[in-house]
């Protein structure tokens, strides 16, 4: 009988301690509650959250953050697959999800060396386009994307990773064809709207 009483008392104390620990964890404010008062706090997400493929990740984002960044679905290779064709399907899913969940959306990114539209730098024969042609294509791309998301995206990562780690210009095709002023041009184009 003494062993049963001791065991019952031990279980009761353990469950009380566990309940107190769980209760105190529930009282810890979220990152959004603590820091979101002062600035945007967020995460880069893909369409797996809006598509319901990552419910655990979606819960974390909903609870902890007040802002989301489009990880891949708003990049040029995704939303501008052909010269005269845009595909905003995935970016729109993310924008819809952000609005539905009260999250500020940041667009990423308008000009980047790594994932531009495949056709951006070459003509139909595979030759590099002229400076004027690339400036026109960059203008067209930025204007169409920014116009499409106007009022839904709070801000844009306009030019991404234009510099190497040592501070020198990245020798991207934007840089090689247009020169360093491609950065200023991209910001001017994005700012027009």
What are these regions (language model features)?
Residues 7-12, 36, 91, 183:
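Generic alpha-helix initiation/capping and coil-helix boundary signal
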Residues 21-22, 44-57, 76-89, 163-168:
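Acidic-and-aromatic substrate-binding clefts and catalytic sites of carbohydrate-active enzymes
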Residues 21-67, 71:
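Boundary/entry segment of secreted carbohydrate-active catalytic domains
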Residues 13, 49, 137:
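Short, motif-level signal for alpha-helix interfacial/capping segments enriched in acidic residues
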Residues 3, 40, 104:
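Residues at the starts of beta-strands that form the adenosine-phosphate
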Residues 1-24:
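Bacterial Sec-dependent N-terminal signal peptides
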Residues 28-29, 63, 67-81, 90-193:
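Substrate-binding cleft and catalytic face of glycoside hydrolase catalytic domains
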Residues 13, 35-37, 61, 149, ...:
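Short, structurally constrained coil/turn elements
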């Amino acid at each position: 009988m003494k062993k049963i009483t001791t065991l019952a008392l031990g279980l009761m104390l353990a469950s009380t301690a566990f309940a107190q620990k769980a209760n105190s964890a529930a009282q810890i404010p979220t990152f959004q509650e603590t820091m979101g008062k002062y600035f945007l706090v967020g995460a880069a997400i893909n369409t797996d959250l809006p598509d319901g493929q990552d419910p655990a990740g979606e819960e974390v984002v909903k609870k902890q953050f007040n802002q989301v960044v489009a990880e891949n679905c708003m990049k040029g290779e995704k939303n501008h697959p052909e010269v005269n064709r845009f595909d905003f399907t995935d970016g729109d899913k993310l924008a819809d999800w952000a609005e539905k969940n009260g999250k500020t959306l940041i667009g990423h990114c308008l000009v980047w060396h790594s994932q531009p539209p495949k056709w951006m730098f070459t003509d139909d024969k595979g030759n590099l386009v002229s400076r004027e042609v690339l400036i026109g294509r960059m203008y067209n791309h930025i204007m169409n994307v920014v116009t499409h998301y106007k009022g839904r995206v709070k801000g844009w990562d306009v030019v991404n990773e234009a510099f190497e780690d040592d501070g020198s210009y990245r020798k991207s095709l934007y840089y090689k064809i247009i020169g360093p002023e491609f950065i200023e041009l991209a910001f001017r184009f994005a700012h027009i709207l």
